Each structure stands twice: as structure tokens, then as C-alpha cells.
Amino acid sequence: MGNTATKFRKALINGDEGLACQLYESNPQFKEALEPNASYGEPYQHNTPLHYASRHAMTRLIRSFLFCKDGNPNKCNVHNETALHLLCMGPQILLGEGALQPRFSRPQEDQQKRAECLQMILQWTGAKLDQGEYERANVNATDNKKSTCLHYAAAAGMKNCVELLVKNAADLFVENEDRETPCDCAEKQHHKDLALSLESQMVFSQVPGAQEIEAEYAALDRREPYEGLKLQDLRRLKDMLIVETADMLQAPLFTAEALLRAHDWDREKLLEDWMSNAEECCQRSGVQMPTPPPSGYNAWDTLPSPRTPRTTRSSVTSPDEISLLSPTDGLALCGICMSSISVFEDPVDMSCGHEFCRACWEGFLNLKIQEGEAHNIFCPAYDCFQLVPVEVIESVVSREMDKRYLQFDIKAFVDNNPAIHWCPVARCERAVRLTRPGPGASDPLSFPLLKAPAVDCGKGHLFCWECLGDAHEPCDCETWKMWLQKVSEMKPEELAGVSEAYEDAANCLWLLSNSKPCANCKSPIQKNEGCNHMQCAKCKYDFCWICLEEWKKHSSSTGGYYRCTRYEVIQQVEEQSKEMTVEAEKKHKSFQELDRFMHYYTRYKNHEHSYQLEERLLKTAKEKMEQLSKAFIGRDGAPPDTTFIEDGVHELLKTRRILKCSYPYSFFLEPKSTKKEIFELMQTDLEMVTEDLAQKVNRPYLRTPRHKIISATYLVQQKRREFLASVARGVAPNDSPEAPRRSFAGGTWDWEYLGFASPEEYSEFQYRRRHRQRRRGDLLRLHSLRSNTPEPHDSSDATAGTALPETQHMNEPLNDTHTHSEICALGSLDEDDPNILLAIQLSLQESGLALDPEPQDSDASVGASGSSLPSRLDSVPQTSDPPRASMSSSELLELGDSLMRLGDISSRYTPFNINSYPDALGTAFSPSDPDCLDPSTNANLLGNIMAWFHDMNPQSIALIPSSASDAGNETHALGEPAKAEQTEAESAEMESKEGEVSECVEDAKTEASDLTVCPESSADPQHQIVEKLTLRGHKISSGGLRRNVFSLGRRWKGFSCITK
């Protein structure tokens, strides 16, 4: 039993099919006990009998193992190989593993046997799976090298096995560990026919959604904004333009052609001149004004109809020309040779009426054509500028001369048409027409064009539209010239070691900036802590870190360990260090510029080299298309569409050329700008999709399905157009400099926002404010406010900052003490702050105060609304009588000074207002007098000031009763007149200040006699003012706002503002 098994195993290993079959069939007991799925163990790499039978293609044993012994072809050995792997390897691959030498002499027979065994394995069905299907041989199983059975079959060149595997859904695109597909394996082993067959099946493989992708790509408009034209296309384009123009103008073809030629073949320009003055337009073009065609003439021609007999002479012949008739027979004479024109000669009619014999016509036209003046041939008569129609030229000259005339005519058509250029390549007779989209064009091709777009004549000749040189988009011609000049100056072929030199210069600069050399061995030393006594770790030299001199020269007299007082030596060392640093910086900057240039130049050359390599694909693309068509036609019966290969190569070359020229464009962009960042992002995106398409197309054998190549081509085309359109639009707007931030509260206003005509005027205004003369009493007032403020007497004043109820009296007499908050506010008072003055002026403008003391009707304070200051300024009603309150800056300043002085005195001694003082005439202003009191004006003033403060500062403002009212315990209504009792000391002090108060009131009344500042009125002023002010918020924290509001509130009869 054991001997039979051993002999059978050896026969299987050696590939002796006859001996193995004899042992297997002759011993029924051994046959019954044999397990084809049992492994022979680790010494035999865990191969099974089925593995060895498949390796040597033993047909009878494989059939018996699969269908009689329940053999499983999916069983793997130690290399993760199944029976299919070993079967498809072939004798070339298994040469060192058995007696396969005789099979080389019979390769066809061996391939046939392996195909039969493969077919049996593919027909095998195993156990029933969970999904209701039966287990089958896995044709896509991979071994340790990630190779499938199709890889081995393709490498062995077994065409029949490959076809069977492909029919059974073998994966054509799977790659092994060497990133090779089955097609690559066949090509590597020089099985070209098999590789071409696999390539065609890979390219034209159908997957779900592939047809939709191809149909979508076919429906796309892949036209470019230019069109290559042949000579026939140029003639057809010219004829169509003439016919369409003649139809629009209702003119003969010859007239329409002459008009177009005179207007550079621009129909829009012609129509504009035609609509302006048609007769003058025809006169400048050398043609007569078209008239309705007479009977017997064609509508679109100038030649007479064949049905109409020819007249003896033109009806428009002048009297002078009538004398040229022959006196004998009445025949016309030729105006050139003076010979009689025979009646049997074909007529040459001109609209001008001049007649010449046919021989003279032919000689004249031949001479003009030979001279190259084919587009402007006038009548040969003296001082006649009538153009000769094309029909006349074609009917007179010979056929050869007519062809030459047509060539000159087409050349003149192209030369005079700014939308058409000839191809600059030698011996190329093609032209290019460029279509520039107009503004708001709805055509899908109406993306913006570059200044110097690249065009193609149709033969692959790319050139710049502007300079007719090599195509260089997205660069314009000037940028391209600058780049070429830069390359010639830098000589990059001589800059091989720029990167290394740049790194050395950067290291040298860092060492000079962060270290010092040893005074003995010049080794760089970096100090991070400690005293000035340094010891070189290399040469053990002791020196001073400051002056780099020997440490022996230092002692306590030179500053000790942490100072060095040797001035001359230190200065010398610093100068040397500075010179070395400056030199290193220059060197580093120079190498930095060189390194930057090499960065762009290297990538420029890389794309240029790739373009040269991929340009060869144009020659092989057509051959590849024919080969794929022939290889795939046997299966489908109809040749497939292979134009996608050529389209992909063309798109790849276009994009590669743009990427090549994009680096010169990026080189001249402003460094670290938004435009450059966006441009480089788009450039990187375009490079990624271009390289992906290159990997799919630039291969000896394509390994990508057609729909994926089509999708990649379309994606590259879309990215390319977006890239060029973005560059044409400017990529991104230029980076604008940061605008100066305006400061409002507590600071200065911009001159334009304040209404000044220029910054100089605003500066002059500020200068006048700072240097104005002080009035009598100002210095005393400021001195008393800032220096002589008495201290609080008791602790009860510390609570003066708390808010009181609205019903508390605000008109109690003031004592000589102030709360701490009032003292701080008065001490920080800044009378030069222009913000408070601006607020007063705006309030006066809105109030509309007049010169006369009569009250004016005004609405509630717009300052209480939530609108901003500019909107409130715009909402001021325009009246026919402008208000007097719009005072100048100097008047407003003087008024502010007077109010401040008046407010300081009045707020400290008595709750009065300026209307309670006598004016210059001795009359007194009473608050209850309707002729001089406007409560809405006062409320509007304070409301606008509070609204302005709220707009300038996000925090809020709280107005509370002043601390002066804290001393009183009685409660009075806010709107009642002030009737507080004064002590004798207060009366005496009041009398001493009466002169100063009168002077302040007089100044204020002189500058603004119509100003009333009185919050007290009979119309419940407490309710009005508090309601208006509480709408604006509750507190502020800015120092400037606190000073302004406090200074105004302090003078506003019993109100003050404090910081909470």
C-alpha cells in the first residue's frame, strides 16, 4: 500500500502520466483510499494530488479527481496557489520543477491538453452555498505574488486558455506585485498578438454606465474658439460673407464685396457706416450707390441677362466719349488702342460706361494680376475709380491667370481681415480664424480669451495669435520675451549646483546671525547662557564673548565676568561682524533668487521634455487605432470607434504645453500674493489631471477602458479651459492695501467724514484750535477744576454714584463738596476733544435754530431712534430757509468754551440755565417765556449727543441725577423751576462770581443768541429727557466718552454721567 502511494506520488511529481494512471487504475483499493485534496505535507509545499495533476495537465486523473473523488480546485498550497495557477503556468514557467523537456518539442499539443483540463476545471461545481449557488473554480484567486491564473496563461502565451478565462469573467485589469496586468505579462514575454488581443478587450470592455459616459462625451461641444481653414474653406467663407451682406443691403454681390473690402471684411463696421450715410459709404468704397435693378438684369449681378440684346454703347457714356465713335460705321472706339470694337466681340461692360477692346482688357488685367494687385483693380480709364467686377476678370483672363487671381484674392481677403491669420509655418497654406466672444455672449464657447491665445491651423501647427511665434499661453508676448531674456541671462545650464550653494549661503548667514567664531580656531560657537568667559570645546582657548580677546586681558577693571568695557576692541569686533553679516546677506539673497529661478526653470524644462516624449504618440496613435479595430472586429463584427485615442493625445499635448508656459507666468507674479496662491492651486490641479491622462494614454499597450480614457480627456479639457479663462480674467483682484481704520469715540475723526475738503484744511483747523487765545477766566476755571477741588467730608458721599429714583429732586443747591466720581471726571476733562463739538453742531442743524428768538416746531429727538449718525444726517428735512445753527468751526469752538465756563460755574452754585442771566441789554431770559424757550430743541440736542455716543461705542450710557442732589433730602419734580434756598455763605460766594458768570453769558449770547439749553419746561421735561436718554442704553466705559458726556451732563442742569 505504501509502496503504491509512494510510486504514485513520484509519478505525479515527475509528470509521468502513464505510470500514474496505471498505478491509479490497477489498484482499486488505493484508488478508493486516495484523497485528491489531501496535502503531501510541508516537504512538498502542501501540494495535493490535484495540484500535481494540474501542473502536468494529466487529463484522465483530473477528470477522475474532480468528478469522482470530489476534488476541489480552489485548494491552495503553501504559496497560495490553486490548481488553476499550476495548470496555466505552462512548461516554460515550470521548467525547473519536473520532466517537462519533451513538451517543448510539442507546444501546440501541450497547450491543447491544458485547455482541455482548464475547461474541465471551469465546469466543476462543488458544494451548495448559502445563496443557493454552487461553488465554482475561482478564476480571480491570487497567489503570494498577487498573480492570477490569467497572468500565468498570458505570460506562457497560451491563447486558448486565455480566451477561456476571459469568457469566464477573469479580471483583465488586476495587477500583480510588479503592477503588471495580464496584457503587460504577455507583452513582457513578447507575445504581441496575445497582448494586442488582451488590450482590445480591456479597452472595449463594457461596464455598467460606460455607454452613458461615452454618449455624454459625444454630445459635448469640443470646439475651440479658433478654426483651421483650408483654401476651399476660405473661399466658401468669403462667398458666404458676401452673399449674406448683399442680402442685408439689397445690393449686388460686387458692390457688397467692395464694401466689405473697404471695411476690412467687418460686417458690423460696414453696417454702422451704411446706416450713417449709405451714399458716402459707397463713394469711399469705389462703387456706385445700388439702385433697383432694371428689367433684364439679375438681382444679384451686374452683367446683363442673356435674353436682353446688347446695346451699341453704354447709356451712361459722357459727351466726350461719344466723340470716340467711328465716323464711318458708328462703331465704338477702344479708349486704349483707339481701334474700333467689333460687334462680334464679346462685350466687357462696366457700370461706369467706359468701353475697351477685349485684347486691351486682357493685357491690362494680366499686368495687374502679375503685380499682385488683385483686390483693387480700377477701370483703366483716366481718373476713373470704378472697381472692376470679379465676373469681368474671370470672363477676360485665361484659366491659369484666373487661378492666380483667385489666390491673390484669397490672400488679400486674409491679409485685410483682422479675424483671420495665415499659418506662419513654411509651405503651409492654411489659415486660422479666431472668434472673440462679445460681452454677455450666451455661447458655451464664450469664455474670455487671453491677450495672446494659441491657435492651431488644423495640421498641428500651434502658434501665438499676436506675435505668430511659438505658442506661449497663458503668458502674453511681453512676459514670454522677459522669460526668454531671463533664461539667456541666467544661463541655467551652468547653474547645476545652485541649490547646494543656496543652502551653504543660508547656513553661513545663520551662523553669522546666531554664533561667533572662536578667536583661535574660528569654529562657530553659540552662547545660550552664562557669563562672558568662553572656552572653545575644540581648541580649549579662553576668550571674552564680547570683544573676542584673550581672557587674560580681562579683570574686574574691564567689567568682570558679565561686562566688558574695552570700547575700541568691541567697536572693531562689531564692525567686522556687521560687514560679514551684510556680505552674507547679499550672497544669500543672490543665491535665493537663483534658487527661485531654478525652481521654475526646472519644472518648465520637465514639462517641455514630457511634451517632446508625448508628441511621438501622434504618430503611433493612428497605428494603435487600426490595430485595436482589427483585433476587436472578430468578436463584434463592426469596427469600434477609436478616435478617442487621438483626441486624448491632442488634449494631452495642449495641456502639457500650457503647463510648460505656466511656470514663466508664475515666475513674474507678485510673491506671496493672493493671485499667485490661487494660480498655483489651479496649476497643481491641472497638473494632477494631466498626469492621470498621461498614464492612461502614454503606454505601449493601453490598460484602461475606453470610457475612463474619455472621462479623463474631458476632465483635462474642462480644467484647461477653466485655467485659461481664470488667467484671462486676472486670476484674482490685486491685493489692496489695508485701509486706515477710523477712530471715533475718544479719538479723531477722518477729515472726509467730518466734511472737510482736504486733509490740509482739517490740519489747519486742528492747529487753530490748539493755538487759539484763551479768554479771561479760562485758566482760573481750569485751575480751580483740576487743582483746588475740595475733598469729601463724610463717608456718605461715597455712595453718590448709585442711581436715584426718577422722582428725586435735581435742583437742590450744591455745596462745595463733590463725590469722588465727579472729581475724577472733572480732572480728566479734555476741552480739545472735537467729538462733543461735532455732536452739538449736528444737533443744532437738526433742530433748525433761527436767528430770531421765536420758537420753531420740531419733532421728537431723532437721536432716540436706532439709526446711525449718517442716516440721521441724510434725514434732515430740506427747507427753503436754511437754519442759522450751521455755524462755522471757529464759532462753534467759541460757543463751546462759553458753555463749558458757564456750566462749570452754574453747576457748582445754583441750578440755573443760561436763560436766567441778563443779556448785553440788561434783559433777562425767563425759562417760561415762550418767545425764547424751545424745549424740544434742548431735548433734541442731548438726545442726539447720546445717540451719537451710542453709535460710536457698543456700550451704553446711563444718566443719573448728579451727586449734587445727593446732599438734599427733599424731593421735587424734575421739571419745576429751581427754588432752592441758599445759605449766606453761598450767597456771598455767588456774588463774588457774578462778574465772571455775566461775562460767560455775554460771550455765549453774542455767539449764539438763538441757543437755549434748558431741559426744564412745562411739558414734563423729566419724562421727555429721561425717556429719550434711556432709549440709548445704560452705561459707558471709554475714557473719552466719559469725559465728553460728563462735561455736557455736568452743565445740563443736574445731570451727570458716571462709569459703572
Curated annotation (Swiss-Prot):
Zn(2+) 2 binds at residues 352, 354, 379, 384. InterPro entries: Ankyrin_rpt, Ankyrin_rpt-contain_sf, Ariadne, E3_UB_ligase_RBR, IBR_dom, Rcat_RBR_ANKIB1, RING-HC_RBR_ANKIB1, TRIAD_supradom. Residues 284-322, 779-801, 850-889, 965-997 are annotated as: Disordered. Residues 603-632 form a coiled coil. It catalyses: [E2 ubiquitin-conjugating enzyme]-S-ubiquitinyl-L-cysteine + [acceptor protein]-L-lysine = [E2 ubiquitin-conjugating enzyme]-L-cysteine + [acceptor protein]-N(6)-ubiquitinyl-L-lysine. A zinc finger (IBR-type) spans 402-477. A zinc finger (RING-type) spans 334-384, 518-547. One of its GO terms (cellular component) is cytoplasm. Residues 831-850 form the UIM domain. Residues 330-568 are annotated as: TRIAD supradomain. Residues 304-319, 858-868 have a biased composition (Low complexity). Gene3D superfamilies: 1.20.120.1750, Ankyrin repeat-containing domain (1.25.40.20), Zinc/RING finger domain, C3HC4 (zinc finger) (3.30.40.10). The active site is at residue 531. Zn(2+) 4 binds at residues 518, 521, 536, 539. Keywords: ANK repeat, Coiled coil, Metal-binding, Repeat, Transferase, Ubl conjugation pathway, Zinc, Zinc-finger. Zn(2+) 3 binds at residues 464, 467, 472, 477. Members of the RBR family are atypical E3 ligases. They interact with the E2 conjugating enzyme UBE2L3 and function like HECT-type E3 enzymes: they bind E2s via the first RING domain, but require an obligate trans-thiolation step during the ubiquitin transfer, requiring a conserved cysteine residue in the second RING domain. Might act as an E3 ubiquitin-protein ligase, or as part of E3 complex, which accepts ubiquitin from specific E2 ubiquitin-conjugating enzymes and then transfers it to substrates. This is Ankyrin repeat and IBR domain-containing protein 1. The lineage of its organism: Eukaryota, Metazoa, Chordata, Craniata, Vertebrata.
